[in-house]
Amino acid sequence: MANRMILNETAWFGRGAVGALTDEVKRRGYQKALIVTDKTLVQCGVVAKVTDKMDAAGLAWAIYDGVVPNPTITVVKEGLGVFQNSGADYLIAIGGGSPQDTCKAIGIISNNPEFADVRSLEGLSPTNKPSVPILAIPTTAGTAAEVTINYVITDEEKRRKFVCVDPHDIPQVAFIDADMMDGMPPALKAATGVDALTHAIEGYITRGAWALTDALHIKAIEIIAGALRGSVAGDKDAGEEMALGQYVAGMGFSNVGLGLVHGMAHPLGAFYNTPHGVANAILLPHVMRYNADFTGEKYRDIARVMGVKVEGMSLEEARNAAVEAVFALNRDVGIPPHLRDVGVRKEDIPALAQAALDDVCTGGNPREATLEDIVELYHTAW
């Protein structure tokens, strides 16, 4: 069986990596950027770390800062209009997953106008042309949207999130610069960090996993498990490790898919605007326990790289240890323990479960889930 890997054309790593942006732009002959971001990142000076360099280099830019968490179809349309009126010929995404996902949708629709209805891009998007060129600068250590071929948009009318998978949307250049991430508050570091861990664990056990992605995912789990506590506590070296770990996870899962944790998390964002990382973090250990018997020896590997001494453990003991290691990490970094703590209503669980069953990510889960299974999992996590 042939396995495909799609990655950035170029990626820069390390503190100060954003300094390479101006040379990348000049080398490619781009004329004017539309920066896609949010108002918070403008107000706190993060965007200026990029625009100051562009100004000094004489590079033209405009900005769309209307992105909101769990970006909606309305946001995409608004940003698309700004791009079309800006005279820009490339895009710069500055932010976490929401600005990057919005940027991908803008870039794809701009070059594939027959998909102006954003809903038509759901699933495996049948576009014909590559996106408008995107340079991606993540400001969180979590989503890895800068290296994935996926983006997620919220349909506010139908109260659902949908995933678009399109090789045409991957950014040409990514700048993985921990200097752009240092300003995250501890709670955001925790949520985005466990989001990255979820990507690595789900990618490791997903149905499409193979040798190369397994190597990426188990290394990502090791990096994230070793660095997240320190990063949340303010250790800058740990923060730089998280920047790398989340990217390595993205290299893997983008090419093989995810599973039921993401399938169940997406409806929470659509129904309640729950931060995606928080939803994943709460659900992850519960879904891991549900999947345990369908993962071979992989939970033993997970437990080992998370610091558990697995020598002499039975397979069942090692699987339980992996789940407990995730629960412990969640507790240590301050993740809310229950869905009810983040506003999920028990009476909504049947509708949430149906949406999760229909989510594109659920199909990659190693254990085939029924509607009843998902209802029970939501109740367990509630």
From Swiss-Prot:
Residues binding Fe cation are D195, H199, H262, H276
Q: In which pathway does it act?
A: Carbohydrate degradation; L-fucose degradation
Coiled-coil region(s): none
Gene3D superfamilies with a match to the protein in the record: 3.40.50.1970, Dehydroquinate synthase-like - alpha domain (1.20.1090.10)
EC assignment: 1.1.1.77
Name used for this protein in its record: Lactaldehyde reductase
The entry's stated outcome for G16D is: No effect on enzyme activity
A Gene Ontology molecular function term of the record: alcohol dehydrogenase (NAD+) activity
Any one GO CC term of this protein is: cytosol
Q: Name one Pfam family in it.
A: ADH_Fe_C
Reactions catalysed, semicolon-separated, are: (R)-propane-1,2-diol + NAD(+) = (R)-lactaldehyde + NADH + H(+); (S)-propane-1,2-diol + NAD(+) = (S)-lactaldehyde + NADH + H(+)
Q: Partners and quaternary state?
A: Homodimer.
Task: Recount the known activity regulation.
Answer: Inhibited by Zn(2+).
Cofactor dependence? Fe cation
InterPro entries, per database record: ADH_Fe/GldA, ADH_Fe_C, ADH_Fe_CS, Alcohol_dehydrogenase_Fe, Lactal_redase
Is the keyword Phosphoprotein assigned to this protein? Answer: no
Keywords, A to Z, come to: Carbohydrate metabolism, Fucose metabolism, Iron, Metal-binding, NAD, Nucleotide-binding, Oxidoreductase
What gene name is listed for this protein? fucO
The EC class name is oxidoreductase
Task: List residues binding NAD(+).
Answer: 38, 70, 97-101, 139-143, 148-150, 161, 180-184, 276, 341
Question: Can you cite a GO biological process for this protein?
Answer: L-fucose catabolic process
Q: What is the effect of changing H199 to A/F?
A: Complete loss of iron-binding
Family, as annotated = Belongs to the iron-containing alcohol dehydrogenase family.
